[in-house]
Protein backbone atom coordinates (compact mmCIF):
# COMPACT_ATOMS: atom_id res chain seq x y z
CA UNK A 1 0.00 0.00 0.00
CA UNK A 2 2.68 2.50 0.98
CA UNK A 3 4.80 1.50 -2.01
CA UNK A 4 1.85 2.12 -4.33
CA UNK A 5 1.11 5.55 -2.87
CA UNK A 6 4.72 6.67 -3.15
CA UNK A 7 5.44 4.84 -6.39
CA UNK A 8 2.90 4.29 -9.13
CA UNK A 9 0.32 6.74 -7.79
CA UNK A 10 2.91 9.51 -7.74
CA UNK A 11 3.88 8.61 -11.31
CA UNK A 12 0.23 8.37 -12.43
CA UNK A 13 -0.62 11.79 -11.03
CA UNK A 14 2.38 13.33 -12.76
CA UNK A 15 1.26 11.87 -16.07
CA UNK A 16 -1.84 14.05 -15.82
CA UNK A 17 -0.02 17.17 -14.65
CA UNK A 18 -0.83 16.75 -10.96
CA UNK A 19 1.93 17.17 -8.39
CA UNK A 20 1.47 14.35 -5.89
CA UNK A 21 2.14 14.66 -2.16
CA UNK A 22 1.07 12.42 0.67
CA UNK A 23 1.22 11.79 4.37
CA UNK A 24 2.11 8.34 5.71
CA UNK A 25 1.07 6.78 8.96
CA UNK A 26 -0.88 4.13 10.83
CA UNK A 27 -4.49 5.29 11.01
CA UNK A 28 -6.07 5.08 14.43
CA UNK A 29 -8.70 2.57 13.23
CA UNK A 30 -6.01 0.12 12.15
CA UNK A 31 -4.05 0.67 15.38
CA UNK A 32 -6.45 -1.69 17.17
CA UNK A 33 -5.17 -4.62 15.08
CA UNK A 34 -1.94 -5.10 17.00
CA UNK A 35 -0.33 -7.55 14.56
CA UNK A 36 -1.00 -5.23 11.63
CA UNK A 37 0.07 -2.18 13.63
CA UNK A 38 3.41 -3.71 14.57
CA UNK A 39 4.08 -4.67 10.95
CA UNK A 40 3.28 -1.14 9.75
CA UNK A 41 5.38 0.50 12.44
CA UNK A 42 8.31 -1.72 11.47
CA UNK A 43 8.41 -0.37 7.90
CA UNK A 44 6.99 3.13 8.37
CA UNK A 45 10.32 4.90 9.05
CA UNK A 46 11.59 3.81 5.62
CA UNK A 47 8.63 5.41 3.87
CA UNK A 48 8.57 8.57 5.98
CA UNK A 49 11.80 9.70 4.33
CA UNK A 50 10.61 9.21 0.74
CA UNK A 51 10.24 12.09 -1.70
CA UNK A 52 6.81 13.71 -1.57
CA UNK A 53 5.97 12.81 2.05
CA UNK A 54 4.83 16.00 3.76
CA UNK A 55 3.68 14.73 7.18
CA UNK A 56 3.15 11.76 9.46
CA UNK A 57 -0.57 11.04 9.48
CA UNK A 58 -3.42 10.74 9.79
CA UNK A 59 -2.74 9.61 13.33
CA UNK A 60 -4.60 10.06 16.59
CA UNK A 61 -7.68 8.49 18.12
CA UNK A 62 -10.81 6.71 16.93
CA UNK A 63 -12.27 4.70 19.83
CA UNK A 64 -9.58 6.16 22.14
CA UNK A 65 -8.19 2.77 23.15
CA UNK A 66 -4.88 1.91 24.79
CA UNK A 67 -3.52 0.54 21.49
CA UNK A 68 -4.46 3.73 19.66
CA UNK A 69 -2.66 5.71 22.33
CA UNK A 70 0.47 3.55 22.09
CA UNK A 71 0.83 3.90 18.33
CA UNK A 72 -0.14 7.57 18.32
CA UNK A 73 2.72 8.27 20.69
CA UNK A 74 5.14 6.12 18.70
CA UNK A 75 4.32 8.03 15.53
CA UNK A 76 4.74 11.38 17.24
CA UNK A 77 8.26 10.28 18.09
CA UNK A 78 8.78 9.25 14.46
CA UNK A 79 7.66 12.72 13.36
CA UNK A 80 10.24 14.24 15.69
CA UNK A 81 12.98 11.95 14.38
CA UNK A 82 12.18 12.78 10.75
CA UNK A 83 11.44 16.49 11.36
CA UNK A 84 8.04 16.14 9.69
CA UNK A 85 4.74 17.85 10.50
CA UNK A 86 1.93 15.78 12.02
CA UNK A 87 -1.60 15.35 10.65
CA UNK A 88 -4.05 14.42 13.41
CA UNK A 89 -7.34 12.59 12.96
CA UNK A 90 -9.89 13.71 15.53
CA UNK A 91 -12.44 11.01 16.39
CA UNK A 92 -15.97 11.02 15.05
CA UNK A 93 -17.38 10.00 18.44
CA UNK A 94 -16.65 11.95 21.61
CA UNK A 95 -14.77 14.39 19.42
CA UNK A 96 -14.05 17.06 22.02
CA UNK A 97 -12.51 14.63 24.50
CA UNK A 98 -10.46 13.03 21.74
CA UNK A 99 -9.28 16.40 20.47
CA UNK A 100 -8.20 17.57 23.92
CA UNK A 101 -6.42 14.28 24.53
CA UNK A 102 -4.63 14.56 21.17
CA UNK A 103 -3.35 18.05 21.94
CA UNK A 104 -2.27 17.05 25.44
CA UNK A 105 -0.31 14.08 24.12
CA UNK A 106 1.38 16.20 21.44
CA UNK A 107 2.52 18.58 24.14
CA UNK A 108 3.69 15.72 26.37
CA UNK A 109 5.97 14.67 23.50
CA UNK A 110 7.28 18.18 22.96
CA UNK A 111 5.72 18.67 19.54
CA UNK A 112 5.51 22.33 18.51
CA UNK A 113 1.83 23.15 17.78
CA UNK A 114 2.91 24.98 14.62
CA UNK A 115 3.94 21.58 13.23
CA UNK A 116 0.56 19.94 13.89
CA UNK A 117 -2.46 20.01 11.58
CA UNK A 118 -5.56 18.94 13.51
CA UNK A 119 -8.15 17.72 11.00
CA UNK A 120 -11.92 17.08 11.02
CA UNK A 121 -12.65 20.02 13.31
CA UNK A 122 -16.11 21.43 13.90
CA UNK A 123 -17.80 24.24 15.81
CA UNK A 124 -17.14 22.45 19.11
CA UNK A 125 -13.37 22.08 18.72
CA UNK A 126 -12.19 25.13 16.76
CA UNK A 127 -11.77 27.47 19.74
CA UNK A 128 -9.51 25.11 21.66
CA UNK A 129 -7.41 24.11 18.66
CA UNK A 130 -6.76 27.71 17.61
CA UNK A 131 -6.24 29.01 21.15
CA UNK A 132 -3.53 26.39 21.73
CA UNK A 133 -1.66 27.37 18.57
CA UNK A 134 -2.44 24.45 16.25
CA UNK A 135 -3.54 24.46 12.61
CA UNK A 136 -7.30 23.85 12.50
CA UNK A 137 -8.31 21.89 9.39
CA UNK A 138 -11.87 21.16 8.27
CA UNK A 139 -12.87 18.30 5.96
CA UNK A 140 -15.60 19.34 3.53
CA UNK A 141 -17.71 16.25 2.76
CA UNK A 142 -21.17 15.80 1.23
CA UNK A 143 -23.74 15.07 3.96
CA UNK A 144 -21.18 14.29 6.69
CA UNK A 145 -18.53 16.17 8.67
CA UNK A 146 -18.30 19.85 7.63
CA UNK A 147 -20.33 21.39 4.79
CA UNK A 148 -19.50 24.48 2.74
CA UNK A 149 -22.22 26.61 4.34
CA UNK A 150 -21.00 25.87 7.86
CA UNK A 151 -17.39 26.40 6.80
CA UNK A 152 -18.15 29.84 5.41
CA UNK A 153 -19.87 30.75 8.68
CA UNK A 154 -16.74 29.73 10.58
CA UNK A 155 -14.51 31.77 8.27
CA UNK A 156 -16.79 34.75 8.79
CA UNK A 157 -16.60 34.37 12.57
CA UNK A 158 -12.97 33.30 13.11
CA UNK A 159 -11.10 34.57 10.09
CA UNK A 160 -8.48 32.50 8.29
CA UNK A 161 -5.44 32.53 10.58
CA UNK A 162 -4.24 28.89 10.92
CA UNK A 163 -7.49 27.63 9.34
CA UNK A 164 -7.24 25.04 6.54
CA UNK A 165 -10.14 24.00 4.30
CA UNK A 166 -9.58 20.50 2.90
CA UNK A 167 -11.49 17.59 1.39
CA UNK A 168 -10.91 14.10 -0.01
CA UNK A 169 -11.40 11.85 -3.01
CA UNK A 170 -12.62 9.12 -0.70
CA UNK A 171 -13.62 5.52 -1.32
CA UNK A 172 -17.21 6.50 -0.66
CA UNK A 173 -19.18 9.64 -1.49
CA UNK A 174 -16.94 12.67 -1.79
CA UNK A 175 -16.58 15.97 -3.65
CA UNK A 176 -13.11 16.48 -5.17
CA UNK A 177 -13.92 20.15 -5.87
CA UNK A 178 -15.21 20.86 -2.36
CA UNK A 179 -12.37 23.25 -1.50
CA UNK A 180 -12.82 25.28 -4.68
CA UNK A 181 -16.59 25.39 -4.25
CA UNK A 182 -16.25 26.46 -0.62
CA UNK A 183 -13.85 29.20 -1.69
CA UNK A 184 -16.33 30.42 -4.29
CA UNK A 185 -19.18 30.45 -1.77
CA UNK A 186 -17.03 32.32 0.74
CA UNK A 187 -16.27 35.03 -1.82
CA UNK A 188 -19.96 35.30 -2.70
CA UNK A 189 -20.79 35.72 1.01
CA UNK A 190 -18.32 38.56 1.38
CA UNK A 191 -15.36 36.84 3.01
CA UNK A 192 -12.28 38.89 2.00
CA UNK A 193 -10.33 37.34 -0.87
CA UNK A 194 -7.12 37.39 1.16
CA UNK A 195 -8.78 35.30 3.88
CA UNK A 196 -10.20 32.85 1.34
CA UNK A 197 -6.80 32.41 -0.29
CA UNK A 198 -5.21 31.74 3.10
CA UNK A 199 -7.77 29.17 4.25
CA UNK A 200 -8.10 27.38 0.92
CA UNK A 201 -4.50 27.55 -0.27
CA UNK A 202 -1.83 29.46 1.62
CA UNK A 203 -2.19 27.90 5.05
CA UNK A 204 -1.95 24.34 3.74
CA UNK A 205 1.16 25.32 1.80
CA UNK A 206 2.65 26.91 4.92
CA UNK A 207 1.81 23.97 7.19
CA UNK A 208 2.90 21.11 4.94
CA UNK A 209 5.71 23.15 3.41
CA UNK A 210 7.51 22.81 6.74
CA UNK A 211 8.39 19.30 5.55
CA UNK A 212 10.73 20.76 2.94
CA UNK A 213 8.90 18.62 0.38
CA UNK A 214 6.30 21.09 -0.89
CA UNK A 215 6.84 24.52 -2.41
CA UNK A 216 4.73 26.70 -4.68
CA UNK A 217 7.25 26.48 -7.51
CA UNK A 218 6.37 22.79 -7.83
CA UNK A 219 3.19 23.69 -9.70
CA UNK A 220 3.94 27.24 -10.87
CA UNK A 221 6.96 25.87 -12.75
CA UNK A 222 5.74 22.33 -13.52
CA UNK A 223 7.53 19.52 -15.26
CA UNK A 224 6.53 18.46 -18.75
CA UNK A 225 4.07 15.64 -19.41
CA UNK A 226 5.09 12.63 -21.46
CA UNK A 227 2.55 9.82 -21.36
CA UNK A 228 4.84 7.52 -23.33
CA UNK A 229 6.86 7.03 -20.14
CA UNK A 230 6.55 3.84 -18.12
CA UNK A 231 6.75 3.05 -14.41
CA UNK A 232 8.16 -0.41 -13.71
CA UNK A 233 6.97 -1.39 -17.17
CA UNK A 234 3.45 0.00 -16.65
CA UNK A 235 1.74 2.74 -18.67
CA UNK A 236 -1.22 4.94 -17.74
CA UNK A 237 -2.53 4.59 -21.31
CA UNK A 238 -5.62 2.41 -21.79
CA UNK A 239 -7.87 1.49 -24.70
CA UNK A 240 -5.56 2.62 -27.47
CA UNK A 241 -5.58 6.23 -26.28
CA UNK A 242 -2.98 8.48 -27.86
CA UNK A 243 -0.32 9.68 -25.41
CA UNK A 244 -0.29 13.34 -24.38
CA UNK A 245 3.06 15.09 -24.61
CA UNK A 246 3.15 18.68 -23.31
CA UNK A 247 5.96 21.09 -22.62
CA UNK A 248 5.55 23.27 -19.50
CA UNK A 249 4.88 26.39 -21.56
CA UNK A 250 1.60 25.02 -22.94
CA UNK A 251 0.28 23.74 -19.63
CA UNK A 252 -2.74 25.35 -18.01
CA UNK A 253 -2.25 27.57 -14.98
CA UNK A 254 -4.63 28.46 -12.16
CA UNK A 255 -5.68 31.53 -14.16
CA UNK A 256 -7.09 29.28 -16.87
CA UNK A 257 -9.49 27.52 -14.50
CA UNK A 258 -13.10 28.63 -14.15
CA UNK A 259 -14.85 26.79 -11.33
CA UNK A 260 -18.56 27.50 -11.04
Cite the ranges covered by each PLM segment.
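Mid-domain alpha/beta scaffold segments of enzyme catalytic cores
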Residues: 1-83, 88, 93, 100-101, ...
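Active-site glycine- and acidic-residue-rich loops that bind
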Residues: 30-38, 139-148
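Glycine-enriched alpha-helix->loop->beta-strand junction motifs that scaffold or abut catalytic
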Residues: 52-53, 74-75, 80-85, 106-113, ...
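Conserved, mostly hydrophobic/aromatic
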Residues: 22, 58, 79, 136, ...
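Active-site neighborhood of phospho(di)ester-bond hydrolases with catalytic His/Asp-centered motifs
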Residues: 23-25, 56-57, 116-121, 137-139, ...
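Histidine/acidic-residue-rich catalytic or RNA/ligand-binding cores of hydrolases
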Residues: 66, 96-103, 126-132, 145-156, ...
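Short acidic/histidine-rich active-site segments
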Residues: 158-176, 196
